[in-house]
């Protein structure tokens, strides 16, 4: 904690969720003030049904040349030649939930090779930790993971990277949202965003300078 939020006289209490959809629901219903999560199909469905929340800042995007999300296959599959999207045909692909950003990513990536989702077996596992566990135990053949999970899996030795998502389909994956109640409090909302921007700039500058690597990874 670098004290950026305290500098703006804000006390932040993180609440953790297992997947993107519950975060959007909690934010739209003002159970939490601020949400940071993927821009998913369920989010658009909520907006279409009249539920309100405000997208206020970038959280993450896929861009060529930058490590964000990637297709990871089990080490055994990689050793046996599953080193391309085309080689995924008939394979079991782990995702968190249907309609998630990972679901969208694999569909779009397959399209770049003239393939469809029907060419693979999608296995919804509910949460990212379950996807990683299934990859390690070889209950699935591949998955889309994001950082720092990509690095964790590769260091552990049970997964190999095939391709970065951003190298094939640049797009906005996630954002910061304000709840309907929180967005009405302009003073607090602005102060929160100032603190958030300070934190993002610290992270970016430290990463570029390769400082505080352990803390950034954690």
Regions found by a protein language model. Name each.
Residues 1-116, 121-125, 141-147, 164, ...:
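Short, glycine-/small- and polar/acidic-enriched structural segments
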